[in-house]
Design a protein with these regions (language model features):
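Non-catalytic interaction/Regulatory regions outside core domains
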Residues: 1-120
Length: 120
């Protein structure tokens, strides 16, 4: 199964999902599936910016010997983004409407991340 197929499957399975992306920790997009429209100017650019938040969280956890960061969520008035580490170099992120199914998004990230890691 291709990266895009996994990302598309996550988007189709989560109510309110507007995007699912596989990205490098450097913020470079590997692949993204967009669905619907978000009330945000540019979802792709926003997800790239969020990669910096994930990097900062990982560095803070390492500095304080708190262990590895598995997941980071960012909720704004217009969008909720949940990112999950796939490997030390990659993560996947789902963006959804504030009233979207956050629990299902988190579950699908958890079960899909190992599949993507095998394909990297």
């Amino acid at each position: 199964m291709s990266f895009r197929a996994h990302l598309e499957q996550v988007c189709q399975s989560v109510d309110g999902a507007v995007a699912c992306s596989l990205m490098g920790m450097d913020g470079i997009e590997v692949d993204t599936h967009l669905t619907g429209t978000a009330d945000v100017a540019d979802v792709r650019s926003l997800l790239v910016e969020y990669s910096g938040v994930l990097r900062s969280a990982r560095e803070a956890a390492e500095a304080h010997e708190a262990g590895g960061v598995a997941e980071v969520s960012i909720a704004t008035d217009k969008l909720v983004a949940v990112a999950r580490q796939v490997s030390p170099e990659y993560f996947m992120v789902v963006a959804l409407a504030p009233d979207g199914n956050l629990g299902k998004a988190r579950y699908l990230l958890r079960v899909t991340a190992p599949k993507l890691e095998k394909e990297l």
